[in-house]
């Protein structure tokens, strides 16, 4: 086996024990702190208290699922790997498309590189939308909870997952979808013992429940039990998140929304601007496709600065940037973002047109993400790490660097 693997200009040491990197979708640090304080997450509590290393990191912008999962598994920001949303306007096709196809990925992954070098690699994701991106050119086991009953050796590198896990295939809108990921990960570590494993959950619970609530604490208690078991099995464990989560509603419980397409249409007329919401994915029931980040494309370049200035003056808007400035500040691919990039404040979300958002599935006040307010995420490791500069800006895509390069090596 090689001693080092270089991927996207970052070099990683070969693992000396199994490494499990966990992306807990929507995990604002307060969820962990509240569960520890309630006494339901003793393992995480021990890591934070000094049995491991507890850091706070920044996720990439926009603070959505696809850009951050792909940053974690490539070790680089979206400006390099190309995945800048769950959804984008494809200028080559002239249409709005989901960003789930590996053709949109511009670099290889750490997972694929290690598998090509002979490592046993496994990926388990909650939603199937991520599976092909995470498993791009990777040899090994790769499946989703969502479609665990449809796995095959040819497509997924494994079979009979449902029987092995001992759980029925969960609803996409459930805590059980993420629990399936963890239980399956434990089963794989017990039997196949992969060298490298990536587990990615869904944020259904975080969209529904605030930190410290019974529902949230029950969810983190489940995570805690499974992480403790992976530790018992001898794995190095790195836990991070793709983004945080915040309340985005008014005092009356209604979503605090700026319908930006309607607003711009009223200013300059219809069909002169297109608002894209990169939070959009096939699973909108728990967030109504409302997040704190939007892209604006304008038919007339001369309108850009005037429209940007008017957007910046709207109540609830935090940041408005032109394309080049946004690409530089947020490390985004300039050819895949709008003429104008808009970020709303912590308690506000951005919609397109009022009649394009079905909010009937919101049975609790809206919680969502996408802005800089959701950039701070946990970065926990169950080992000591070698000393790092106090000024280092930790990123969630440093997870593999921590687990392979900086964690104290086994004796």
Summary of predicted features, one role per range:
Residues 1-52:
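Active-site-proximal N-terminal segment of extracellular/periplasmic enzymes that hydrolyze or transfer
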Residues 13-14, 174-239, 243-247:
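A long, amphipathic alpha-helix that forms part
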Residues 26, 241-245, 346:
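Active-site metal-binding loops of divalent metal-dependent hydrolases
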Residues 29-31, 81, 129-135, 205-209, ...:
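Short catalytic/ligand-binding loop motif for oxyanion handling, primarily in non-cytosolic enzymes
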Residues 32-76, 122:
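Short, structured active-site-proximal loop/turn typified by the sulfatase FGly-forming signature C/S-X-P-X-R
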Residues 71-210, 286, 292, 298, ...:
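His/Asp/Glu-rich, glycine-adjacent segments
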Residues 228, 245-297:
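Acidic/histidine-rich catalytic neighborhood
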Residues 277-411:
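Active-site neighborhoods of enzymes that stabilize oxyanions during catalysis
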């Amino acid at each position: 086996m090689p001693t080092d693997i270089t991927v996207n200009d970052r070099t990683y040491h070969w693992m000396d024990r199994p490494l499990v990197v966990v992306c807990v979708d929507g995990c604002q640090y307060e969820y962990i702190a509240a569960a520890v304080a309630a006494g339901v997450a003793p393992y995480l509590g021990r890591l934070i208290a000094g049995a491991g290393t507890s850091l706070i990191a920044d996720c990439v912008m926009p603070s959505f699922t696809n850009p951050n999962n792909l940053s974690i598994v490539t070790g680089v920001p979206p400006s390099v790997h190309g995945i800048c949303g769950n959804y984008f306007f494809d200028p080559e096709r002239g249409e709005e498309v989901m960003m789930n196809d590996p053709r949109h990925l511009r670099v290889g992954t750490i997972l694929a590189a290690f598998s090509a070098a002979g490592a046993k690699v496994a990926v388990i994701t909650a939603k199937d939308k991520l599976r092909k991106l995470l498993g791009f050119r990777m040899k090994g086991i790769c499946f989703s909870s969502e479609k665990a009953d449809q796995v095959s050796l040819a497509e997924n590198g494994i079979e009979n997952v449902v029987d092995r896990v001992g759980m029925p295939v969960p609803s996409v809108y459930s805590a059980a979808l993420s629990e399936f990921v963890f239980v399956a990960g434990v089963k794989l570590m017990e039997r196949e013992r992969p060298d490298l494993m990536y587990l990615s959950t869904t944020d259904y619970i975080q969209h529904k429940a605030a930190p410290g609530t019974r529902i949230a604490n029950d969810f983190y208690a489940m995570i805690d039990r499974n992480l403790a078991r992976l530790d018992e099995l001898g794995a190095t464990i790195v836990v991070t998140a793709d983004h945080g989560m915040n309340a985005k509603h008014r005092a009356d419980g209604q979503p605090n929304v700026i319908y930006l397409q309607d607003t711009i249409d009223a200013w300059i007329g219809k069909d002169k601007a297109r608002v894209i919401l990169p939070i959009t994915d096939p699973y909108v029931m728990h967030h109504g496709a409302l997040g704190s980040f939007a892209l604006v494309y304008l038919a007339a370049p001369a309108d850009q600065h005037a429209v940007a200035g008017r957007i910046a003056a709207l109540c609830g808007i935090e940041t408005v940037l032109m394309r080049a400035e946004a690409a530089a500040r947020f490390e985004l691919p300039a050819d895949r973002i709008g003429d104008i990039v808009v970020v709303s404040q912590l308690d506000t979300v951005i919609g397109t047109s009022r009649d394009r958002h079905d909010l009937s599935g919101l049975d609790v006040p809206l919680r969502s993400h996408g802005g800089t307010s959701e950039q701070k995420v946990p970065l926990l490791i169950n080992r000591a790490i070698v000393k790092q500069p106090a000024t280092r800006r930790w990123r969630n895509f440093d997870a593999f660097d921590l687990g392979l390069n900086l964690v104290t090596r086994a004796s």
